[in-house]
Amino acid sequence: MNPNQKIITIGSASLGLVILNVILHVVSIIVTVLVLSNNGTGPNCNGTIIREYNETVRVERITQWYNTNIIEYIEEPSNEYYMSNTEPLCEAQGFAPFSKDNGIRIGSRGHVFVIREPFVSCSPLECRTFFLTQGSLLNDKHSNGTVKDRSPYRTLMSVEVGQSPNVYQARFEAVAWSATACHDGKKWMTVGVTGPDAQAVAVVHYGGVPVDVINSWAGDILRTQESSCTCIKGDCYWVMTDGPANRQAQYRIFKAKDGRIIGQTDINFNGGHIEECSCYPNEGKVECVCRDNWTGTNRPVLVISPDLSYTVGYLCAGIPTDTPRGEDSQFTGSCTSPLGSQGYGVKGFGFRQGNDVWAGRTISRTSRSGFEIIKIRNGWTQNSKDQIRKQVIVDNLNWSGYSGSFTLPVELTKKGCLVPCFWVEMIRGKPEEITIWTSSSSIVMCGVDHKVASWSWHDGAILPFDIDKM
């Protein structure tokens, strides 16, 4: 092949490759256009990605534009509907562990708040543990003297249920040394009581914003439930006390919508005493089991209707459930009057199950140690001593404390009834132990369709801490 033929051959081959390359590009463009024009079958250059995190919910709108990501943080969408909460309570055969925060054990080397009065409340999406901090951390000098109930440093904060009350995941709710909180299906409502004893004020927050206030009307330590309030069809109910802790005081029911108070009524309960009610929804009404800090070792029972009419009395059962208390065998029970002369008391709870009642109490008759829940046949309506079931939650070798009720909404469980749940506070430190501080952790239990074995889910922290040895 002469040189001219070689040049022609190479040129022809090059031209062929160029033509092939052009054809491939044309085919590529055609395929791309066909794919992008086919709605729903191909990727879109613009899109929205929603990411949720456990601690809080952060919604990101991420627009993917060529090779550039534009990230825009948008407000978390609120729920559209109020929860009904008119369903009946589920029948519980036993109570299974839901969560345990181990806050004091973790706090020996972690950044955990000094707290008291923890309680749990649920929204349609989650349950949260609320607690009253002392404005200080465990194993720190500012924990000294935190046995005191009321101070300007106390705040209501919350974490997802099961998390320790740590500084990294806690959410501020209100300035408070007494509080309640609940979710109506759209937003959280919190009530935080703070201020001087004679002129305390309760600030009602809705969606994190102060909306309304309640001023002390008796001038004697206005206080509230220290457990979940109750929302039914968008209206939220709670109980407050103002007056002496050891004689006749004044009691009121409050009703709010979207955080604004729309009704209130005085509770006429001469000779009786109501504090720290543990309430839950049941068949369209609010049922509360409370604390008599005056004389009764039986617990007050308050049932609230949506129109704020109410019935009030005492848990009928012939078994006492407050602390301190006398022997079970010496207790007769009363549906209308306080029985006993021990005075003082501790926050507690009970659940109506038809005519029966599940009631929690300390195992010790004289101190806040141990905890059990017992089922008393006909105990809601009669002076029955027929104890048909018992489950130990904390053995009597370990400290307990307050306890209270809440329910799992049907939006969480997909059941046709409200699951009864309770929490038990386990107080550590002063006044029972040699420390400079007082704090607590909690165990949370929920009703199930099966019997559950007794055990001791106690606090378990080894005291004293380093700060106590200085």
Swiss-Prot record:
Coiled-coil region(s):
none
Q: Which domain of life is it from?
A: Viruses
Spell out the subcellular localization from the entry.
Virion membrane; Host apical cell membrane
The entry's substrate-binding residues are R116, R150, E275, E276, R291, R368
Stretches the record annotates as Head of neuraminidase: 89-470
**TM helices/strands, residue ranges:** 15-35
Binding sites annotated in the UniProt record for Ca(2+): D292, G296, D322
- List cofactor names only: Ca(2+)
Entry-listed glycosylation sites: N39, N46, N54, N144, N293, N398
Residue intervals on the Virion surface side: 36-470
- In this chain, the stretch annotated as Hypervariable stalk region covers 32-86
What domain notes does the record hold?
A: Intact N-terminus is essential for virion morphogenesis. Possesses two apical sorting signals, one in the ectodomain, which is likely to be a glycan, and the other in the transmembrane domain. The transmembrane domain also plays a role in lipid raft association.
Assembly description: Homotetramer.
Q: What does this protein do?
A: Catalyzes the removal of terminal sialic acid residues from viral and cellular glycoconjugates. Cleaves off the terminal sialic acids on the glycosylated HA during virus budding to facilitate virus release. Additionally helps virus spread through the circulation by further removing sialic acids from the cell surface. These cleavages prevent self-aggregation and ensure the efficient spread of the progeny virus from cell to cell. Otherwise, infection would be limited to one round of replication.
Output this protein's name: Neuraminidase
Give the species.
Answer: Influenza A virus (strain A/Equine/Miami/1/1963 H3N8)
